[in-house]
Design a protein with these regions (language model features):
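ASCE RecA-like P-loop NTPase motor cores
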Residues: 1-321
């Protein structure tokens, strides 16, 4: 019985692999990638870049009405991105789409502040200098807040660099440094953070969403870099190819709205109840220096937004924690 089940399972895998290599590879709207762990292939994956036709044929045409609810449907305050990505443009043109943007029940103007540091090195042009400045800023923040700080990174390399610089500086401070991939898995790090009076948690994509730290558990959230996907990211690479073939601007069509939604999700980790209070800090100066920075500013649920210099970090953080 078990052998027969394994044979059927292998046949299923074989059929799917054949479909991917014989059919999906020919399509420009497909992303195909291998998941590799410790030098061994774990998964062969295929995913659609655009799901609008599938949603239309499999869902929209079979219902008379549909309600989509989420905290991250908008970029800035516009629904255009989600309407386009979900294949609803035709229905919008027919006047069949209604949108509603409800304000948060939280009083962000009283509960939180978004600090944007505008004199950091450019993370793309001066990555080494940026890492040093991030280390200095995190040390400053952790010592000011006395722990209860979570820093969100976008790059494993930078996370490792900053961790290596910061760990000896925090030695003897009483502040526990908890770093993804170094100090335990997600559950262990979250448990350590919750049960430590003074802790600085540094993590990657997993921590940008799905983390719920209410009350005094999180006083300061640090966004190290704006969460643009790396050009080497399979999805970003495939999107770039797709946009090029369809003569679309990759940055405006995909990269910017994708990053803005992830940014909103990350900032949303700070205030989780009506009693929370805290400060969010963006260490990527592109949020103030680049024209597209306004998209991120407008995507933040925090309306109190202050532009500061590096030397003002401690003073401003102290005001809100």
């Amino acid at each position: 019985g078990d052998i027969q089940a394994y044979i059927l399972q292998l046949k299923d895998f074989s059929d799917k692999a054949f479909t991917i290599f014989e059919e999906d590879l020919q399509r420009d709207d497909r992303l195909i990638w291998l998941s590799i762990s410790q030098g061994r292939v774990q998964e062969l994956c295929s995913s659609l870049l655009e799901i609008n036709n599938e949603l239309d044929n499999g869902l929209y045409q079979h219902v008379s009405s549909l309600i989509m609810v989420s905290a991250t449907l908008t970029v800035g305050e516009s629904f255009d991105h989600i309407i386009r990505r979900c294949g609803l443009s035709r229905y919008q043109q027919e006047g069949r789409i209604r949108t509603l943007l409800e304000r948060s029940p939280f009083h962000y103007e009283e509960q939180a502040c978004l600090l944007m540091v505008d004199d950091m090195a450019d993370p793309t042009r001066e990555p080494e200098q940026f890492s040093y400045q991030v280390t200095e800023a995190l040390l400053n923040i952790a010592e000011t807040v006395k722990g209860r700080v979570m820093a969100l990174f976008t790059s494993r390399k930078m996370l490792s660099e900053v961790s290596g610089l910061l760990r000896p500086l925090l030695k003897g401070s009483g502040i526990a440094l908890l770093v993804q991939n170094e100090d335990g898995d997600f559950a262990a790090l979250m448990d350590g953070f919750v049960n430590s009076e003074k802790a600085l948690l540094m993590g990657l994509e997993t921590y940008w969403e799905g983390v719920d730290l209410k009350g005094d558990l999180l006083k300061c959230l640090v966004v190290v870099k704006l969460p643009f996907r790396s050009p080497s990211d399979p999805y970003a690479s495939a999107a770039e190819k797709y946009c090029r073939l369809h003569r679309l601007n990759t940055f405006n069509y995909f990269m910017l709205p994708d990053a803005a939604v992830r940014f909103k999700q990350g900032i949303g980790r700070l205030i989780r109840s009506e009693d929370d209070r805290g400060v969010a800090i963006v260490l990527d100066s592109r949020i103030t220096r680049q024209p597209y920075g306004k998209v991120f500013q407008n995507s933040s649920p925090i309306s109190n937004q202050v532009i500061i210099s590096r030397k003002e970090i401690a003073q401003q953080v102290e005001r809100w924690t």
